[in-house]
């Protein structure tokens, strides 16, 4: 065995061995408990980045650890391959998006393999391939028939740079999540998935997810946004009809002084017909930001519509204002404005000199009038007629009952969650399987005619989608009547593909169904790993899709992911690595210069997985040095002759202490990998053990047996993190055996018991020394031994021993007087 650490050779050999032996091929035929470990699949951008390396190493460590613990492990990999960057790259490089994507997949697959991931590559999927998206189209048609997908003209978030519609979740602080452009509002016919039909279950089932970070569950709860309130109808002052609002504070109704409506509200459109100034204001609002966070902080603007409504209880005339702080998508697109008890209403009323009427005061004390700010706490009603003196709960009930008696309101539970608009005006996505027929209207494509294949040989000119200009794609016949018809040319939001891929891995080669019975063996995913930035978007959609698949009879479980680990970002110079900042490090260079094991070790040692990791060249050097130390330690031991069978004689105190540390390390590392996912402290414990190993002296049979035991266990403990070097070193230590067929070590409890303990010695409570004694020594023997110690003898001359106090396993206090 050579003394130098030949990382390139051993990594190539290990990877070839795993591939030729199909080591990581998963099967459902097993008597072992299953463990499905999944890291969020990558977008094939062309190159791995350090975030990928970290994400996939975490998953790989857990997969390898569980395999050695006796689990039947599946760790698959695939490609989230549709999406806008492929179109942009195609325009830039004058290639078709498909060719660019497939070329990137091949390159990145090679990079992932060079990391030594324990992946079952036979399960590889690419979401842009027809054999994948045909099932997405099939599910679309099933949901369409059930009414869970519908089409309506809606005010949508329009990204003027990417030229497409964005879901609410894809608008971050008023800007497109990918382009960063300020989002506009437009009215466009869209297909929607009825995620609101599952709002209550999506909310309630969060309580089942004990293995998820609380932060992610809180973000989803807030996004779903369940609230209890009241639907209130304000009769129009002129003509028939009412203006509906939703409020969570019915107790404040008596303080309403105007009603505010969104720019897109039907009443606003009606009022603007003869009012050019109002029409111009409405257009200005539509161009504004649509993010709730922006609405909260933006300057409040409004215009009187000239319309009036009647207060449902007092009959008082209230003006209707068009306001930029009202969302058409929440409640009814209208709010009853109570300036005295709502901050936004107060700000708006103050600006436009509208009445501010206080009707709630603190339960104890008075309200200082005139108000300098809105009083938003719950309290007691006053100046509210029959409702005076009631608290929040009593007033809410009484006012709801009064409205119901007049047929002008009722109790209502409301969700902030909106239905998911999935239509995209882009080319590189899954075609929506709908045919538009002049006679039959919208007709879903029958299952036997699926997939509707996206043509891949296209020319991107940067203006719109090529399939919208391609008669060969959109000209067709109606599946229902056979007449000439046209295909839908919008494609689906790419978040649809990633909402069910976890199930397809389990039935990767199913030809007659979306998933088959194998999915019920593997699902739910035992451990899911990905960034916290997916907390709402992807993770909510995947939970929704799992329930959709359950309800069409494809899977049995309610939730897709049992445990979730959200890994932190990789930083350099304090900020996230990015091309624009020029602070990236190419993983390929790292692997070429130091090896995949060094890259993996650094990534796992530099920080706990949930925290951000700061890149450090010195840290990489340190990781490489440590692997060299391990290699050299094994090489030296092998050179002196490996120990085939342990024959341990009586151990010296030094060897006992070392063996105790060895088995304590096994126990700690097992807990760190399995329960805590604290890979950094596991590595630190093995490093400490290596330091102790270096201090062992002697070459007798017992010492060499201890060395062999230590090195074997060190290799096993490190193998999930640095599998290549461990594969090679195990063969050197145990010729003819394979590391991956070896079970995970179990700590020897007997070896961890400390035979001897150190007791502190005190005289009259003051520290005077210490002594080492057998753990089994009784109290009388300890007392006798204590007074014989040299450090105690001189104090006994000062008087007689009056009392000896022994605190078991800690100290002996001799009272002299």
UniProtKB/Swiss-Prot annotation:
<dbReference type="InterPro" id="IPR001412">
    <property type="entry name" value="aa-tRNA-synth_I_CS"/>
</dbReference>
<dbReference type="InterPro" id="IPR015413">
    <property type="entry name" value="Methionyl/Leucyl_tRNA_Synth"/>
</dbReference>
<keyword id="KW-0067">ATP-binding</keyword>
<dbReference type="InterPro" id="IPR025709">
    <property type="entry name" value="Leu_tRNA-synth_edit"/>
</dbReference>
<protein>
    <recommendedName>
        <fullName>Leucine--tRNA ligase</fullName>
        <ecNumber>6.1.1.4</ecNumber>
    </recommendedName>
</protein>
<dbReference type="InterPro" id="IPR009080">
    <property type="entry name" value="tRNAsynth_Ia_anticodon-bd"/>
</dbReference>
<dbReference type="InterPro" id="IPR002302">
    <property type="entry name" value="Leu-tRNA-ligase"/>
</dbReference>
<dbReference type="Pfam" id="PF00133">
    <property type="entry name" value="tRNA-synt_1"/>
</dbReference>
<dbReference type="InterPro" id="IPR013155">
    <property type="entry name" value="M/V/L/I-tRNA-synth_anticd-bd"/>
</dbReference>
<dbReference type="InterPro" id="IPR014729">
    <property type="entry name" value="Rossmann-like_a/b/a_fold"/>
</dbReference>
<dbReference type="InterPro" id="IPR009008">
    <property type="entry name" value="Val/Leu/Ile-tRNA-synth_edit"/>
</dbReference>
<feature type="short sequence motif" description="'HIGH' region">
    <location>
        <begin position="42"/>
        <end position="52"/>
    </location>
</feature>
<dbReference type="Pfam" id="PF08264">
    <property type="entry name" value="Anticodon_1"/>
</dbReference>
<keyword id="KW-0436">Ligase</keyword>
<keyword id="KW-0547">Nucleotide-binding</keyword>
<feature type="binding site">
    <location>
        <position position="579"/>
    </location>
    <ligand>
        <name>ATP</name>
    </ligand>
</feature>
<dbReference type="Pfam" id="PF13603">
    <property type="entry name" value="tRNA-synt_1_2"/>
</dbReference>
<dbReference type="Pfam" id="PF09334">
    <property type="entry name" value="tRNA-synt_1g"/>
</dbReference>
<dbReference type="InterPro" id="IPR002300">
    <property type="entry name" value="aa-tRNA-synth_Ia"/>
</dbReference>
<dbReference type="GO" id="GO:0004823">
    <property type="term" value="F:leucine-tRNA ligase activity"/>
</dbReference>
<feature type="short sequence motif" description="'KMSKS' region">
    <location>
        <begin position="576"/>
        <end position="580"/>
    </location>
</feature>
<comment type="similarity">
    <text>Belongs to the class-I aminoacyl-tRNA synthetase family.</text>
</comment>
<keyword id="KW-0030">Aminoacyl-tRNA synthetase</keyword>
<dbReference type="GO" id="GO:0002161">
    <property type="term" value="F:aminoacyl-tRNA deacylase activity"/>
</dbReference>
<keyword id="KW-0648">Protein biosynthesis</keyword>
<dbReference type="GO" id="GO:0006429">
    <property type="term" value="P:leucyl-tRNA aminoacylation"/>
</dbReference>
<dbReference type="GO" id="GO:0005524">
    <property type="term" value="F:ATP binding"/>
</dbReference>
<dbReference type="GO" id="GO:0005829">
    <property type="term" value="C:cytosol"/>
</dbReference>
<keyword id="KW-0963">Cytoplasm</keyword>
């Amino acid at each position: 065995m050579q003394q130098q650490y030949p990382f390139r050779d051993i990594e190539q050999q290990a990877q070839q061995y795993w591939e030729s032996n199909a080591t990581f091929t998963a099967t459902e035929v097993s008597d072992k408990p299953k463990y499905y470990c999944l890291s969020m699949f990558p977008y094939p951008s062309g190159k791995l980045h350090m975030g990928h390396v970290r994400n996939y190493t975490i998953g790989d460590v857990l997969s390898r650890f569980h395999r050695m613990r006796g689990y039947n492990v599946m760790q698959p990999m695939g490609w989230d391959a549709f999406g806008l960057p492929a179109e942009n790259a195609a325009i830039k490089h004058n290639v078709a998006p498909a060719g660019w994507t497939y070329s990137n997949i091949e390159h990145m697959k090679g990079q992932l393999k060079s990391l030594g991931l324990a992946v079952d590559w036979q399960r590889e999927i690419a979401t842009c391939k027809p054999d994948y998206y045909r099932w997405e189209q099939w599910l679309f048609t099933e949901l369409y028939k059930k009414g869970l997908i519908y089409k309506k003209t809606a005010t949508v978030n329009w990204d003027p740079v990417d030229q497409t519609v964005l879901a609410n979740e894809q608008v971050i602080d008023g800007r497109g999540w990918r382009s960063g452009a300020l989002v506009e509002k437009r009215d466009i016919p869209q297909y929607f998935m009825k995620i609101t039909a599952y709002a209550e279950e999506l909310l309630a089932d969060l309580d089942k997810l004990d293995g998820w970070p609380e932060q992610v569950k809180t973000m989803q709860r807030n996004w779903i946004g369940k609230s209890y309130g009241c639907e209130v109808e304000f009769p129009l002052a002129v003509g028939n009809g009412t203006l509906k609002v939703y409020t969570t504070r019915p107790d404040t109704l008596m303080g309403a002084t105007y009603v505010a409506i969104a720019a897109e509200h039907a009443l606003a459109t009606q009022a603007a017909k003869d009012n050019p100034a109002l029409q111009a204001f409405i257009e200005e609002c539509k161009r504004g930001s649509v993010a709730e966070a922006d609405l909260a902080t933006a300057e409040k603007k409004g215009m009187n519509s000239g319309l009036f409504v009647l207060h449902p209880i007092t009959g008082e005339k209230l003006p209707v204002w068009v306001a930029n702080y009202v969302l058409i998508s929440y409640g009814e697109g209208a709010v009853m404005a109570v300036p005295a008890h709502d901050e936004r209403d107060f700000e708006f009323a103050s600006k436009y000199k509208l009445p501010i009427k206080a009707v709630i005061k603190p339960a104890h004390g008075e309200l200082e009038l005139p108000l300098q700010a809105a009083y938003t706490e719950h309290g007691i009603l006053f100046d509210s007629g029959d409702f005076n003196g009631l608290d929040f709960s009593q007033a809410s009930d009484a006012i709801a009952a009064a409205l119901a008696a007049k047929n002008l309101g009722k109790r209502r539970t409301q969700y902030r969650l909106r239905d998911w608009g999935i239509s995209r005006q882009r080319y590189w996505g899954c075609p929506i399987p709908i045919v538009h027929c002049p006679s039959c209207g919208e007709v879903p494509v029958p299952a036997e005619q699926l997939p509707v294949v996206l043509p891949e040989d296209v020319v991107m000119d940067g203006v719109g989608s090529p399939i919208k200009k391609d008669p060969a794609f959109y000209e067709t016949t109606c599946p229902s009547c056979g007449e000439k018809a046209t295909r839908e040319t919008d494609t689906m939001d790419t978040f649809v593909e990633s909402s069910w891929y976890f199930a397809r891995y389990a039935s990767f080669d199913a030809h007659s169904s979306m998933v088959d019975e194998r999915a019920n063996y593997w699902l739910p995913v035992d451990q899911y790993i990905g960034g916290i930035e997916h907390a709402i978007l992807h993770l909510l959609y995947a939970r929704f899709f799992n329930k959709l698949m359950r309800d069409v009879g494809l899977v049995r479980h309610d939730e897709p992911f049992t445990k979730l680990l959200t890994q932190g970002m990789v930083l350099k110079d304090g900020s996230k690595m990015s091309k624009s900042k020029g602070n990236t490090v190419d993983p390929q260079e790292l692997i070429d210069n130091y090896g995949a094991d060094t890259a993996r070790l650094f990534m796992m040692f530099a920080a706990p997985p949930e925290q951000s990791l700061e890149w450090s060249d010195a840290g990489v050097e340190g990781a490489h040095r440590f692997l060299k130390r391990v290699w050299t330690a094994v090489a030296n031991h092998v050179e002196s002759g490996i120990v085939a069978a342990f024959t341990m004689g009586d151990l010296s105190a030094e060897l006992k202490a070392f063996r105790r540390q060895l088995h304590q390390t096994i126990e700690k590392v097992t807990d760190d990998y399995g329960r805590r996912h604290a890979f950094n402290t596991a590595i630190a414990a093995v490093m400490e053990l290596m330091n102790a190993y270096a201090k062992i002296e002697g070459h007798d049979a017992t010492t060499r047996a201890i060395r062999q035991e230590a090195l074997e266990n060190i290799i096993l403990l490190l193998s999930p993190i640095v599998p290549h070097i461990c594969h090679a070193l195990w063969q050197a230590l145990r010729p003819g055996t394979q590391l991956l067929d070896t079970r995970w070590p179990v700590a020897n409890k007997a070896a961890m018991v400390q035979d001897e303990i150190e007791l502190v010695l005190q005289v009259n409570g003051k520290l005077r020394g210490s002594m080492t004694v057998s753990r089994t020594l009784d109290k009388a023997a300890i007392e006798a031994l204590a007074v014989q110690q040299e450090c105690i003898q001189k104090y006994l001359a000062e008087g007689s021993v009056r009392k000896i106090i022994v605190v078991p396993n800690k100290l002996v206090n001799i009272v002299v007087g």
